[in-house]
Amino acid sequence: MLEKYKNSKKLSRDLPQINDRIRFPKVRVIDDEGEQLGIFVPEEAIQLAVQQGLDLVVVSDKSDPPVCRILDYGKYKFTQEKRAREAKKKQHNSSIKEVKMRYKIEEHDYKVRINQASKFIQAGDKVKATITFRGREIQHSNLAIDLLNKMASDLNAIAEIQQAPSRDGRNVIMLLSPKKVS
């Protein structure tokens, strides 16, 4: 029972502040053309909006007094949702893709790893290049660092080193990220 009450209170807080839901003593009103009409008591501002057949919507409640706009709420809500969809479409969450290899890699296998890494980078993802060692191979970590530096120079056209080659336990790792297009 208590949780039901919590949720209903939360929902009422999330509702948009339009017309009778505006709970401020005074508001600054802007008409549908963008002109400031002045500071009003919410009841008067709502009457102005109703006379025009529109709604009074709180645009910014952070300022003092809060800014309200006289507009068609349905149209306003639609444009807000459209902007949110566009922003979501443009956003790309880059993840880290890993390319694993050994320090004694053959030339063809190395080229395959380079191709994999370049595909990941062109897709906008970061690439973590990892060279693993077994047993006493760890003595040859300098060869692994050289190999990772060669990989960085081969991908220099599309990627930049975010983290230089370094030892991490039984691995040598390097992090590459796509170059910023300016």
Curated annotation (Swiss-Prot):
Entry GO MF terms: ribosome binding; translation initiation factor activity
Domain of life of the organism encoding this protein: Eukaryota
Listed PROSITE patterns: IF3 (PS00938)
A Pfam family this chain is assigned to: IF3_C
Record's keyword terms, sorted: Chloroplast, Initiation factor, Plastid, Protein biosynthesis
GO CC, alphabetical: chloroplast; cytosol; membrane
Any one biological process term the GO annotation gives: ribosome disassembly
UniProt function note: IF-3 binds to the 30S ribosomal subunit and shifts the equilibrium between 70S ribosomes and their 50S and 30S subunits in favor of the free subunits, thus enhancing the availability of 30S subunits on which protein synthesis initiation begins.
Assembly information from the UniProt record: Monomer.
Annotated PANTHER family: TRANSLATION INITIATION FACTOR IF-3, TRANSLATION INITIATION FACTOR IF-3, MITOCHONDRIAL
Protein name as catalogued: Translation initiation factor IF-3, chloroplastic
Organism, as annotated: Pyropia yezoensis (Susabi-nori)
Taxonomic lineage from the root: Eukaryota, Rhodophyta, Bangiophyceae, Bangiales, Bangiaceae
